[in-house]
Amino acid sequence: KNGKVTGVTLTNVPAFVYKDNLTVNVDGKEIPYTISFGGSFFALVDTTKLDIGPIDAKTVPEYISLGMKMRDLINEQVEIQHPTLDITEVDLVEFYGPTPNPDHATMRNVVVFGDAQADRSPCGTGTSAKLATLHKWGEIGIGEEFIYESFIGTTFKGVIKEETKIGDYDAVIPMITGTANLTGVGTYLIDPEDKLKYGFLIG
């Protein structure tokens, strides 16, 4: 718009619900969750079923702690295998709940991953997994917009392009739209005498 990029849309891999209506016992509490794939396997958890409170900067440390415990327990207890790829574990836990900004977002999340980290964005693969879950539950149709908000207020727009199959699973093709800002410019040089100027391969 007026010579400026206002958004970038990508079409993601097939997303699908792997297992639904699961529970895991964490510190004596049974927590319901769903395993869905959106590029990685996610455990999706409804925060209204928990007693931590709304998703915001103050509660994120508690969600991180719970998410790490859940991820470890789920991978110990649930056999996971992508139907066509060599992916065999839940990598991320996605907590979702009401947004305090319903005028510009549908729902809010915090995605826990890695070494006790929280995604500052709504997570593209996580948004894809959420779209697949909502579609499976009959809560969103093809072409309908879903605006996912992170705990710091950044948003992604998700739309289901079409339905498909992945192995024996009903799946959807998600389209994710987001924005970014230019923060710097770099210059890379090739020295003709550099023996590794074109890189190298291992294995």
Give residue ranges: language-model regions.
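Active-site proximal loop and beta-alpha junction motif in alpha/beta enzyme cores
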Residues: 1-203
